[in-house]
């Protein structure tokens, strides 16, 4: 099969053997691949959790047909089924997924490209907004970095679960202007010193119940100030920096729960439960088409360098996909 492999000379397309599924794995013939920002570091040779370095195939999600099932895979999954999944090593024509991460396409007419961009956004944001953010009818929720594909899904999930105030942040004015299309009741520019006041004004001075923070870095103390007493901050990403000054006194005074989440250290059993809960809450909306992400651009796997460059330029809105055929 063709795959993009990390080498000392950079990312190179090579022919490699098709992997064989383990007892609880599904082999998927990939038709499309979703790109995620973590792919940039892996493609450059950096570690991302347990993966990285020469010989690594980047990629975290994709869609295609089941080619083969391991001996312990439940019988509801069968060869030939159209599926999408979060999994590793998806910059290739075939990839392996734990069976618990594999979902049948919610719409028989859904394109491969669209399906490939959904798994990471769905499971990440349901886990952050609902499981850890405790979003419920009447909640006030903020998504930091809301114009990313994952962020746009977070806005939609918050509204779907009944949040009455949904704040999205973006420093790009064109992207910020579009956040209302995806459920934001307030869009703020975190480069504007007044953004915390805007959030407080929208919540009658209390602050939001939960912030799903994809930015972190130097914004973290302002984010504390925008969160209510006994609120929650869910640390999903660190696009603004992994290390920064932190106002410990404000954190204590507001008694905020600061929760770190990542899939890098979760077991298969934990991820299976995350996917199960996501399906329980969101699948009907996916089937109805009320949860969707904009597809910014589609590349071919042969154009992997151009696809990564497009993502690195950060000019896209929504998700980027690659097709294999």
Give names to the regions the model predicted.
Residues 19-34, 46-89:
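Glycine-rich beta-strand-centered segment in the early N-terminal region that forms part
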Residues 87-100:
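A structural motif shared across PLP-dependent enzymes of the aminotransferase-like
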Residues 90-93, 170-178, 243-248:
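Short, glycine/polar-rich helix-capping loops at beta-to-alpha or helix-loop-helix junctions
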Residues 116-192:
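Mid-domain Rossmann-like dinucleotide-binding core that forms the NAD(H)/NADP(H) cofactor-binding site
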Residues 194-205:
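Short amphipathic alpha-helix with an adjacent loop that forms part of the alpha/beta core around
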Residues 205, 283, 288-297, 305-325:
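C-terminal capping/lid region of NAD(P)-dependent oxidoreductase domains
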Residues 218-290, 323-325:
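Glycine-rich phosphate-binding loop and adjacent beta-alpha segment
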